[in-house]
Curated annotation (Swiss-Prot):
PANTHER family: AMINE OXIDASE, AMINE OXIDASE [FLAVIN-CONTAINING] B. Keywords: Glycoprotein, Secreted, Signal. Glycans are attached at N92, N97, N119, N146, N213, N267, N458. Residues 1-22 form the signal peptide. Coiled coil: none annotated. Pfam families: NAD_binding_8. This is Uncharacterized protein R656. It is found in: Secreted. Its main location: secreted. GO terms for cellular component: extracellular region. One of its GO terms (molecular function) is oxidoreductase activity.
């Protein structure tokens, strides 16, 4: 027999559950997209194109992921009022397809202009001033570039790339060739590629994935980071790479307008994703909460026909998912790089009125780059306004610790180059450049093949910079387009 006080307690529990459900009504969606970066926003727009009604859940207060843009008041008569300090350049896949460099399903130039407007793509321009400084000693470093050796090295390197043509677009799920599992420093040494130090610097060190003598990453990843398609930035016509008018964020602002604010949930923390297994017909359930400016929270719950996980799938970031054993085994092999970026105001009688890049250099390194952690570079593409700053670490440092290191680096830049500086914003790019570790790459069945096999299992799809071998936006957008075209039949 239930005692009266026990019955009252049960009623309180029922009322509590009912009140929670009343405050948090379940919303049904055909697709729930977790993550509002390049992968999540692009796949959501492509899904809407095909008649779907996606919702995007983003943990930050803005969408765009690694696409960071700061706006400022330009001098009178000038029109550029932005500086990108995350993603700055886009590969033009229309031009790459025309020249036979890779096979791309989505035209990045048309895709960007769709959300910004016509004539929104801008050609890449060089800097007025490029300097190399050892930011530990303050010494000015003059790169030793031998044109003959460089041309010979380029010929050898292009031949090497021709042996792995899939590096141009990263669409490869076969067994990784064993020679590409060497560190890039060891792989490159017999071929005399040191003459390409400045080129590898651009795609290795400057991009935040490699440092020192490039022994920290397999050759596989450097060949993809400096693939024939990416190399067009330096060697191809100006039309093969572009910037965008209004800065990188303008692309994602346009995507947000297309999707509608009611379909984008910002400051969203997903706490639980429960999916259907085996013969169950239940749809995935997704729960979490949003955080307001005052710190208060609101719960949400979605019933989703399909779920797209559109952020790098590290185990730490998948704690909310009821992972299968296969998923857990695969994603336990995912690693990330430690990259930081921000914006600073500077004063410099030497640099004022110029576009420039001041790069950290270490002449004791074979590739003239430091071993980290520290500042990579500071620079801007126009001759006025604030400066973007980049930094790299070989360990996962807290932002405050990294800020202390780069402040020291700034202070070591000679005063004739830099008079003063004021760092305005600085943060870590979390889950940057996700990649599979060396042990998993050594298996006969590539982890990229295993990732491809997971698509659609348990009504879940995975798209992020992990799907290809490099984290360029063109690769992410292209992968999103392929997944939508392959697994989501048009509802129109």
């Amino acid at each position: 027999m239930i005692r009266p006080n026990m019955f009252a307690l049960l009623m309180l529990v029922v009322l509590a559950i009912t009140s929670v459900n009343a405050d948090c009504p379940k919303v049904k969606r055909d697709v729930c997209v977790i993550g509002g970066g390049a992968a999540g926003m692009s796949i959501a727009t492509l899904l809407k194109d095909r008649g779907y009604d996606p919702v995007v859940l983003e943990r930050e207060s803005v969408v765009g992921g690694h696409c960071n843009t700061q706006y400022f008041d330009p001098p009178e008569g000038e029109t550029v009022d932005w500086i990108d300090y995350g993603v700055q350049l886009f590969m033009n896949t229309t031009q790459l397809n025309l020249t036979g460099v890779g096979s791309w399903s989505l035209a990045t130039d048309k895709f960007a202009e769709r959300f910004i407007g016509p004539n929104a793509t801008l050609p890449l321009e060089g800097n007025d001033i490029n300097l190399y400084v050892n930011m530990e000693t303050g010494e000015l470093v003059i790169p030793n570039v031998n044109e003959t050796a460089l041309n010979n090295a380029l010929g050898v390197y292009f031949y090497l790339l021709s042996m792995y043509p899939w590096t141009s677009d990263g669409k490869y799920t076969g067994t990784i060739p064993p020679e590409l599992l060497q560190s890039f420093g060891d792989f490159a040494s017999p071929f005399g590629l040191n003459a390409m130090a400045e080129i590898f610097r651009a795609f290795g060190y400057n991009s935040g994935i490699a440092y020192g003598n490039y022994t920290n990453l397999p050759a596989l990843y450097m060949l993809n980071a400096a693939s024939m398609s990416v190399m067009q930035v330096l060697l191809g016509p100006s039309t093969t790479t572009f910037k965008v008018k209004g800065g990188c964020y303008s692309v994602y602002r346009g995507m947000s307008d297309y999707l509608g604010s009611e379909n984008i949930v910002l400051n969203a923390t997903v706490t639980e994703l429960t999916r259907s297994f085996f013969l169950s017909t239940k749809s995935p359930r997704l729960r979490g909460y949003t955080t307001r400016a005052d710190g208060s929270t609101d719960n949400f719950e979605y019933e989703c026909e399909k779920v797209v996980v559109a952020h790098p799938p590290t185990l730490d970031d998948l704690s909310y998912v009821d992972l299968t054993q296969n998923e857990q085994d695969l994603f336990s092999n995912v690693e990330v790089a430690y990259y930081y970026a921000g914006v600073a105001d500077i004063s410099s009688s030497y640099l004022n009125g110029n576009s420039f890049q001041v790069m950290n250099a270490d002449p004791s390194s074979e590739y003239n780059v430091p071993f980290g952690p520290g500042l990579i570079s500071l620079g801007r593409y126009v001759d006025y306004g604030p400066t973007q700053i980049q930094a790299i670490s070989n360990t996962n440092l807290e932002v405050c610790d990294m800020l202390e290191i780069i402040t020291r680096d700034f202070e070591n830049i000679p005063s004739w180059i830099l008079n003063s500086f004021d760092i305005k914003t600085f943060d870590q790019h979390k889950e940057y450049a996700p990649h599979f570790n060396l042990a998993s790459l050594s298996n006969p069945v590539s982890p990229y093949a295993k990732l491809a096999e997971l698509q659609g299992s348990n009504n879940t799809y995975w798209v992020s910079a992990l799907n290809r071998y490099t984290a360029a936006t063109a690769h992410v957008w292209d992968e999103a387009n392929i997944i939508v075209n392959t697994y989501f039949p048009s509802k129109n």
